[in-house]
């Protein structure tokens, strides 16, 4: 009988704490639009003002030159990145670094051989000797 009363008292205290801490405090409650507008206008006045300055001719010319340099460097980089189209390989061989599991044909490169790893689950054509 004493154990059940102790258990019920503990449960009652837990529920009281849970209900007290589940509700937000009064200052965290949602406010209406009027109070939000008044608070936002007060907060904006606290920040320093932003000044806008006109650019002189020299700074405009420098910025234009920098922009042109960036454009030309981007064009050069795009020209350098153009990849050569791959030549189609003949069908009865496997290209270097491609999968070459045992039913596949031999490697196209005469210096390459088929290497398998992880109990022949991952096989690829690799060049073993550079002197070939």
From Swiss-Prot:
Residues 93-132 form the Agouti domain. Pfam families: Agouti (PF05039). Residues 60-88 are annotated as: Disordered. Glycans are attached at residue 39. InterPro entries: Agouti (IPR007733), Agouti_dom (IPR027300), Agouti_dom_sf (IPR036836). Residues 1-22 form the signal peptide. Keywords: Disulfide bond, Glycoprotein, Knottin, Secreted, Signal. GO terms for biological process: hormone-mediated signaling pathway; melanin biosynthetic process; melanosome organization. SMART domains: Agouti (SM00792). Residues 63-79 have a biased composition (Basic and acidic residues). It is found in: Secreted. GO terms for cellular component: extracellular space. Disulfide bonds join 93-108, 100-114, 107-125, 111-132, 116-123. The keyword Signal applies. One of its GO terms (molecular function) is neuropeptide hormone activity. Its main location: secreted. It comes from the Eukaryota. SUPFAM superfamilies: Agouti-related protein (SSF57055). The presence of a 'disulfide through disulfide knot' structurally defines this protein as a knottin. Involved in the regulation of melanogenesis. The binding of ASP to MC1R precludes alpha-MSH initiated signaling and thus blocks production of cAMP, leading to a down-regulation of eumelanogenesis (brown/black pigment) and thus increasing synthesis of pheomelanin (yellow/red pigment). This is Agouti-signaling protein. It comes from Macaca cyclopis.
